[in-house]
């Protein structure tokens, strides 16, 4: 199987399966000399981990990360960093009824046709559990970027199913299980309770923002910053759409509205989402992703078995009624990995470039 490594200068190789003994990643390219411990990583893993509320899967994984290499006396050495997360709460018997049938919306059918066999236990390699190592790697990237440039990453739930979530404050995001930027989430709790009772699932829209991004990141033509962001976000399980800045709303905007005017104090809007010509402007990187409804639901659905005969599928097990609820730290991590990759490229290729035009975003403050 190819396609397990993300990035080049900051390369993250992901390994493991949902019900295997462990999952993890190896990071190649982290600069030496940065203080790093498990505690620097665990916080983001705790935000993503399952079993934290009744609105997500009840699989109870502590997701405790171990640093196996690449750190000596508390500092990164510049050598590969191996991060390990042990699986402790697998329940493979839940998947006994789908050994010979294909679950609608899952990768069962495509994996079998591609590889000639498949691991049905929790989806195996196609499971969203494999996002945990990427969150761990993203935490390493976040730390380096913050210490080097002051770059920060934040995300929130903007919509869950039909329920639009107005933005009130970033301060609310950590105070509820939905990562919602609102003080009162009772309507979201009622919505999810009704959905679970109906044996159904829903999708979500996640917003993620990177602030303090240096000007000049991105490599036209084919490694544009926004192109790599879209590539990274589409690599997250269940993501079916990506918007940068105004995104699809650009279709109905006019040029007099969409183009972000400049002033000595900075850009006057951010329809571009922080990227022009594939290169960062220094404004916030604004990204939204659309996540499809969870495919594993208890409502019976029609499918076929491995012999091609009609079959009815009822998915048992412990599943998220909305996988988007835990996607916020995942999207933050993937955005951080993209910015980290391009920051290292910029340092290597254009680190000596000097311009007389002021950085208007930095000069603001």
Curated annotation (Swiss-Prot):
Pathway: Metabolic intermediate biosynthesis; chorismate biosynthesis; chorismate from D-erythrose 4-phosphate and phosphoenolpyruvate: step 7/7. Reduced FMN (FMNH(2)). FMN binds at residues 125-127, 237-238, 277, 292-296, 318. Pfam families: Chorismate_synt. One of its GO terms (molecular function) is chorismate synthase activity. GO terms for biological process: amino acid biosynthetic process; aromatic amino acid family biosynthetic process; chorismate biosynthetic process. NADP(+) binds at residues 48, 54. It comes from the Bacteria. Keywords: Amino-acid biosynthesis, Aromatic amino acid biosynthesis, FAD, Flavoprotein, FMN, Lyase, NADP. It catalyses: 5-O-(1-carboxyvinyl)-3-phosphoshikimate = chorismate + phosphate. GO terms for cellular component: cytosol. Its cofactor is FMNH2. SUPFAM superfamilies: Chorismate synthase, AroC. Gene3D superfamilies: Chorismate synthase AroC. HAMAP family: Chorismate_synth (MF_00300). Homotetramer. This reaction introduces a second double bond into the aromatic ring system. Belongs to the chorismate synthase family. This is Chorismate synthase. It comes from Polaromonas naphthalenivorans (strain CJ2). The lineage of its organism: Bacteria, Pseudomonadati, Pseudomonadota, Betaproteobacteria, Burkholderiales.
């Amino acid at each position: 199987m190819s396609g397990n490594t993300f990035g080049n200068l900051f390369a993250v190789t992901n390994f493991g399966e949902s019900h295997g003994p462990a999952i993890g990643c190896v990071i190649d390219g982290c600069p030496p000399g940065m203080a790093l411990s498990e505690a620097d990583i665990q916080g983001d893993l705790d935000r993503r981990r399952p079993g934290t509320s009744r609105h997500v899967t009840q699989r109870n994984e502590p997701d405790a990360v171990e640093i196996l290499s690449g750190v000596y006396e508390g500092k990164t050495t510049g050598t590969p960093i191996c991060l390990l997360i042990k699986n402790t709460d697998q329940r493979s018997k839940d998947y006994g009824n789908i050994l010979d049938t294909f679950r609608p919306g899952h990768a069962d059918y495509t994996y079998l046709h591609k590889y000639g066999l498949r691991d049905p236990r929790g989806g195996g390699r196609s499971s969203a559990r494999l996002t945990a190592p990427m969150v761990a790697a993203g935490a390493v990237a976040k730390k380096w970027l913050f210490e080097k440039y002051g770059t920060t990453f934040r995300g929130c739930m903007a919509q869950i199913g039909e329920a639009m979530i107005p933005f009130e404050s970033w301060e609310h995001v950590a105070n509820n299980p939905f990562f919602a930027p609102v003080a009162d989430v009772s309507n979201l709790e009622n919505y999810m309770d009704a959905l679970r009772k109906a044996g159904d699932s829903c999708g979500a829209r996640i917003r993620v923002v990177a602030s303090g991004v240096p000007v000049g990141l991105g490599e036209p033509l084919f490694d544009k910053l926004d192109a790599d962001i879209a590539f990274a976000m589409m690599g997250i399980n269940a993501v079916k759409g990506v918007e940068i800045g105004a995104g699809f709303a650009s279709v109905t905007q006019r040029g007099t509205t969409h183009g972000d005017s400049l002033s000595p104090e900075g850009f006057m809007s951010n329809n571009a989402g922080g990227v022009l010509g594939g290169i960062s402007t220094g404004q916030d990187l604004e990204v939204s992703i659309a996540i499809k409804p969870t495919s594993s639901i208890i409502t019976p659905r029609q499918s076929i078995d491995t012999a091609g005969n009609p079959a009815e599928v009822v998915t048992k097990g412990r599943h998220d009624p909305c996988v988007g609820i835990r996607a916020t730290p995942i999207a933050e991590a993937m955005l951080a990995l993209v910015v980290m990759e391009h920051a290292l490229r910029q340092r290597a290729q254009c680190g000596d470039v000097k311009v007389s035009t002021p950085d208007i975003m930095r000069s603001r403050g």
